[in-house]
C-alpha cells in the first residue's frame, strides 16, 4: 500500500492540461493556408524535370480524380492502342509531398508491356502533356 502511494504521488501531482490553452491562437494558426511561393514551386518543378515522367520523383501531375481519369484515358501504348489500367492504389509520397496514386498499366504485346505510373492528383489547374517513356498521349 505504501509503495502504491509513493508511485502514484507524482502522477497525482501533475495537473492535466485538459481545457487549457497550450499556445496562443496566432501561433497555432501560423502558416496555415500560406502554400508555396512561386519560386518554391519553380524549384520543385525544375528538380522533378530531372527524372522520368510517372515516377515518385516526377509524377504525372493532374487536377483531381477527374484529371487522373482523363489523362489515363488519353494514354496510348507504342502501337497506338489504349493502355489497360489496373486497380489504382497509394504509391508513396512524391517529390511534391503528396501521396501519389500508383496506376498499373498494361499494353499486352505492345511496348511497353507493363508499367507502374505514379500520379499526383493534387496539382490543381495542371494538365500534363507529356507521357511516360514508351507511351503516347492521344490528342484531346
What residues fall within each predicted segment?
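Sec-dependent N-terminal signal peptides
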Residues: 1-5
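N-terminal signal peptide c-region/cleavage motif recognized by signal peptidases
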Residues: 8-10
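N-terminal secretory-pathway/extracellular module detecting exported/lumenal segments
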Residues: 15-99, 107-140
Amino acid at each position: 500500500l505504501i509503495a502504491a502511494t509513493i508511485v502514484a504521488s507524482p502522477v497525482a501531482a501533475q495537473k492535466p492540461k485538459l481545457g487549457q490553452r497550450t499556445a496562443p491562437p496566432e501561433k497555432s494558426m501560423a502558416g496555415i493556408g500560406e502554400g508555396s511561393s512561386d519560386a518554391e514551386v519553380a524549384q520543385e518543378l525544375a528538380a522533378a524535370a530531372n527524372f522520368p515522367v510517372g515516377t515518385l520523383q516526377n509524377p504525372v501531375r493532374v487536377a483531381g480524380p477527374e484529371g487522373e481519369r482523363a489523362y489515363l484515358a488519353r494514354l496510348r501504348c507504342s502501337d497506338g492502342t489504349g493502355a489497360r489500367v489496373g486497380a489504382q492504389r497509394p504509391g508513396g509520397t512524391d517529390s511534391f509531398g503528396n501521396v501519389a496514386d500508383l496506376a498499373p498499366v498494361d499494353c499486352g504485346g505492345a511496348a511497353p508491356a507493363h508499367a507502374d505510373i505514379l500520379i499526383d492528383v493534387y496539382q490543381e489547374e495542371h494538365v500534363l502533356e507529356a507521357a511516360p517513356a514508351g507511351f503516347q498521349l492521344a490528342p484531346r
